[in-house]
A protein has these predicted regions:
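Mobile genetic element proteins and their domesticated derivatives, centered on retroelements
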Residues: 1, 51-53, 92, 98, ...
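RNase H-like polynucleotidyl transferase catalytic core
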Residues: 75-81, 154-176, 191
Length: 191
């Protein structure tokens, strides 16, 4: 009966997704508290805190040219699109130093991650004693990736410049770089 269908505040077509850890997950709590302790550190240019994340992104093109916009009208774009491949977006955020660095690569491999980390320590922070790095525990985010990409002495040199802290499983939202990538996607890339 249409009269019984009243407008309500339920929105089953909308979803907010959260990674909710199991209650009393000791490993989650330990990793979370470690990351939060890192975030409480005062700014120190000799030991900058840098958050790192990466995300895949689908490159799409228009199948047909969008119609010209008119004042007061929305842009009219065809719902059909052309796939132009994918890429990986790497982001480094130094929340206290105010530095943001984003790079785009064709893929996400152990070599790609290792090259980004070398850039971080050698180009972005060449004078820092150590870079305190916060990131998720993705399979390529391991010091072994540096050994896969570089000779052992070079990999070791890079590792000695890092102090790594991993966000907990189901807690990557604690990584400021992930938040920044999500904002960039919503405000820039998805437009």
């Amino acid at each position: 009966n249409p009269k019984s269908l009243k407008k309500n505040k339920l929105r089953p077509h909308k979803n907010d997704y959260w990674c909710i850890p199991k209650k009393d997950d000791a490993e989650f709590i330990a990793c979370m508290e470690d990351v939060l302790d890192v975030y409480e550190l005062p700014y120190n240019p000799e030991r900058p805190v840098v958050c790192m994340d990466e995300k895949p992104y689908q490159l799409l093109g228009d199948a047909r040219k969008p119609l010209p916009m008119r004042p007061g009208d929305n842009q009219k774009t065809d719902s059909e699109y052309v796939r132009n491949g994918t890429c990986s977006i790497f982001a480094f955020v130094d929340p206290l130093g105010g530095t943001h660095h984003v790079s785009v690569r064709e893929q996400r491999t152990a070599f790609d991650w290792a090259e980004e980390i070398k850039y971080l320590v050698d180009v972005m922070y060449p004078d820092a004693e150590k870079v305190i790095l916060v990131m998720d525990n993705l399979n390529t985010h391991k010091t072994a990736s540096l050994y896969k990409r570089y000779p052992a002495d070079e990999a070791r040199r890079i590792i000695k410049r890092l102090e790594i802290h991993y966000t907990p499983k189901h807690g990557s939202w604690l990584d400021i770089a992930e938040i920044e990538l999500n904002v960039m996607t919503r405000q820039c890339l998805s437009r």
